[in-house]
Structure formats: structure tokens, C-alpha cells
Regions:
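Bacterial N-terminal signal peptides that target proteins for export
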Residues: 1-9
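Metal-dependent active-site segment of extracytoplasmic phospho-/sulfohydrolases and closely related
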Residues: 36-37, 55, 209-250, 283
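Substrate-binding rim/cap in mid-to-C-terminal beta-strand-loop elements of soluble/periplasmic
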Residues: 85, 248-290, 301
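Active-site His/acidic residue clusters
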Residues: 139-154, 168-212, 216
Length: 305
């Protein structure tokens, strides 16, 4: 009789645990209606303390941040933007170099659109009517975004006369379309880092200029009437040292990740470890979604209220 009672108790406990798990899954809700995702190519964490970036530092003060998000190796653009958007390491998504325009290793999984699953694709599947856009300066971005899952993607014209063009295009897009997910990827301070050098007066002058653009993008959400419904993310693919990157120094692999807005704690510096491929799962968490099994990234749950 005693054994039967024990088994009965265990059965009740198992059923209760299963019910709780199902309830937790059912309660997973969207945290914010809009995500504004801003990327600065070549922005190393080493520069943040010294940089004159009042808009970025206001986001840091109002939200959560880490200066120890690590890039995947090599610490170059294509492979890291891919890892950021695809929630996985190069061995899985197959993009392995700075200028990858297609996979060099066969993708472990392709769900649709002939590309490894991206955060854009998974949001599109969950919200077929959502406005999703990606605007960028470097043409390599279009190869890792899954443009078929966006409503709008566009590259800015090239040339010094178009320095502020991405900012203008981003502001117009936000005001007109109020994107559910809008990604705006600047190709600086990377160029300045290559030309004048990292950790130079020219590099910091460029960061100040980029911070002004970030301020205009934030203002655009206010003008569009969506500011209170937004989460803002500002991050980078890699840093740099002297005139380059691609190596293993902390100056090259430590990148900022800053998140603020609706439903985000005013928590200051994050205490958890973060990798490049944790960005996409964190974005999906905002929309109440989970990544596919093939993703290795984890959502940064610490940042949410």
C-alpha cells in the first residue's frame, strides 16, 4: 500500500510539473512591439569609456549593457554579422570569412529561402504581416540577412557625399513604415579604423558623428509615435587594433551590446557571458519566440523585467 501511495504521489508531481511547464510556455508573450537594431561595423569595446557618445551612453544608463560580448573568429565582418543574425557559430551557418557572400561550409540546416535560418526569417514566419527592414552601407550585409524575409532592404550610395545617407534613409523608413524589426547597419567606424587607425582622434571623431545619427534614429521613433513601444539595440561585429582586425586580441573580439526600451531593466552592466550568436535569440525573445534547435545562441534573459 505504501509503495502504491509513493507512486501515486510521484505521478501527481509529474503531472503538476508538466502542467506548469506548459503554462510557462503558453505565458511567453511579446515584450515590445518594435525593435530598432543599430549596428556599427568595427566598433571596439575598448573605445566606449573614452568616446563622446551621449545618445549611446543615455541608452546604457536607461537599460542594460556589456562590453564583453565576444566576436566569433575570425574577428571580421561577414562571419560575425552572419553569426549575429543567424544565432549560430560559423561551423553551423557556414559563413567563415570577412567577405562571405555565400556559405563556404554547407549549412547544417536550411528551412527556407536557401539560407540558414535568420532572426528575420523566423519573425516573418511568426508574423507574416510584420514590417521588417534592413538598411545598410556595406553590400556584404545583404548576403547574411535573408532579404526574402524582409519587406524592404536597401544599400546606400557610395561616396563621401553620402556619409549621412543611411541616417536619412533610416529616419524616413521609420517614420513612414514603423517597422516591427528595423536593422540599420553602418559601415563605420571600420573604415576610419583601417585608414587612420583604431583608438585614434579620427576614430573617436567618427564615433561622435555616428552617435549623432543614432540620436536622429531614436528621434524618428518619437516622431512616428512608436518610441514607447520600442526596444533599442546598439552593437557591433568586431573591434580592431592599429589598422586592422581579424585576430584574437581582446581589442578585436570584445564588442559592445546595449539594450534599452520597453520591458528592459534599468540594470546597468550585464553579469552574464555573451557571444555574438546570442544577439538573434535575444531579439526573438522580445517577440515571444524561440530559435530553432540548430541555433546555439541563448537569449540574454537577464535584461528583461
Amino acid at each position: 500500500m505504501r509503495k502504491l501511495n509513493i507512486w501515486a504521489i510521484l505521478l501527481v508531481a509529474i503531472v503538476a510539473l508538466a502542467s506548469c511547464t506548459q503554462a510557462q510556455q503558453a505565458e511567453k508573450k511579446q515584450i515590445a512591439e518594435h525593435v530598432i537594431y543599430i549596428g556599427l561595423d568595427g566598433w571596439g569595446s575598448y573605445s566606449v569609456d573614452k568616446a563622446d557618445m551621449p545618445n549611446v551612453k543615455a541608452l546604457m544608463a536607461e537599460g542594460c549593457w556589456t562590453l564583453q560580448k565576444r566576436a566569433v573568429l575570425p574577428s571580421s565582418s561577414g562571419v560575425n554579422w552572419a553569426s549575429m543574425f543567424m544565432g549560430a557559430c560559423p561551423e553551423l551557418h557556414g559563413y567563415t570569412t570577412w567577405d562571405s557572400s555565400k556559405h563556404e561550409i554547407p549549412e547544417r540546416v536550411i528551412l527556407k529561402n536557401n539560407i540558414f535560418p535568420t532572426m528575420f526569417q523566423l519573425l516573418r514566419d511568426a508574423q507574416p504581416e510584420a514590417e521588417i527592414g534592413c538598411l545598410y552601407e556595406w553590400d556584404g550585409i545583404k548576403y547574411v540577412v535573408d532579404t526574402l524575409s524582409t519587406n524592404y532592404h536597401a544599400q546606400t550610395p557610395k561616396g563621401k557625399e553620402y556619409t549621412d545617407e543611411l541616417c536619412k534613409m533610416s529616419v524616413q523608413y521609420i517614420k513612414e513604415k514603423k517597422p516591427v524589426l528595423g536593422a540599420f547597419i553602418f559601415d563605420n567606424p571600420d573604415h576610419v579604423g583601417h585608414d587612420a587607425g583604431h583608438d585614434t582622434p579620427e576614430y573617436y571623431a567618427n564615433l561622435k558623428e555616428l552617435d549623432g545619427y543614432i540620436g536622429e534614429i531614436i528621434q524618428a521613433t518619437k516622431d512616428a509615435g512608436i518610441y514607447e513601444k520600442c526596444i533599442f539595440i546598439v552593437t557591433s561585429d568586431h573591434g580592431g587594433i592599429e589598422h586592422g582586425h581579424g585576430g584574437k586580441t581582446l581589442e578585436e573580439i570584445n564588442t559592445p551590446f546595449i539594450i534599452a526600451g520597453k520591458g528592459i531593466k534599468k540594470g546597468g552592466e550585464m553579469q552574464v557571458s555573451m557571444m555574438q550568436f546570442d544577439c538573434a535569440p535575444t531579439v526573438l525573445e522580445i517577440f515571444g519566440l524561440e530559435g530553432p534547435q540548430v541555433w546555439v545562441g541563448r537569449p540574454m534573459l537577464e535584461v528583461f523585467e
